[in-house]
């Protein structure tokens, strides 16, 4: 967020006007550059009862090791291109994994799980809410896995 177009262009060895010409602003440049692979595990290989646990553990590990997703989430709140990039990550990566796994309302279930995980990420990595930031990984999994599992198991209304 503190980077300037001039500094970015200088690092790339190009004129700042080229960055502005092709991207328009820093937000659009960031959204175009943000590359994040969720590296989802093969969920079909996980026992049904363990899906909530595996999903929460995986997302927690991904958010902890790569600042790109936190930066993209922060930008998505106020920048349309970053928001669209987040939607693209969901549509291209999360949704297909859940569609292979669940036949009943897979898109809705994936969206609810994604919302749960993103809401948690906002609290822990952006707002840095206490006690969320003090919780251990195991505490987080213990609290959140049953909720995610419920999204998977509960019959659709």
State the predicted function of each range:
Residues 33-37, 66, 93, 120, ...:
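A short secondary-structure junction motif
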Residues 1-28, 32:
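Helix-turn-helix
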Residues 73-74, 95-99:
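Amphipathic alpha-helical segments within well-ordered protein domains
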Residues 84-87, 98-157:
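Hydrophobic/aromatic-rich alpha-helical bundle segments in the mid-to-C-terminal region
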Residues 34, 63-91:
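Amphipathic alpha-helical segments used for helix-helix packing
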Residues 59, 72-76, 113-117, 121:
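Short alpha-helical scaffolding segments that buttress acidic/His motifs in well-ordered protein cores
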Residues 39-70, 141:
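Hydrophobic alpha-helical connector segments
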Residues 36, 62, 79, 120, ...:
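Phosphate/oxyanion-binding loops and surfaces in catalytic or ligand/nucleic-acid-binding neighborhoods
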């Amino acid at each position: 967020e503190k980077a300037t177009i001039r500094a970015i262009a200088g690092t790339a060895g190009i004129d700042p006007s080229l960055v502005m010409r092709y991207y328009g602003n820093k937000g659009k440049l960031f959204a175009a550059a943000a590359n994040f692979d969720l590296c989802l595990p093969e969920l079909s290989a996980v026992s049904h009862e363990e899906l909530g646990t595996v999903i929460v553990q995986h997302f927690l590990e991904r958010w902890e090791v790569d600042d790109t997703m936190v930066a993209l989430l922060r930008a998505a709140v106020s920048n349309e291109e970053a928001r669209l990039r987040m939607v693209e990550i969901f549509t291209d990566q999360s949704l297909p994994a859940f569609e292979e796994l669940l036949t009943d309302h897979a898109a809705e279930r994936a969206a609810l799980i994604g919302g749960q995980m993103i809401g948690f990420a906002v609290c822990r990595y952006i707002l840095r809410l206490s006690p969320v930031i003090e919780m251990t990984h195991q505490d987080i999994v213990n609290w959140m896995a049953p909720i995610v599992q419920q999204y998977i198991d509960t019959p659709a209304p």
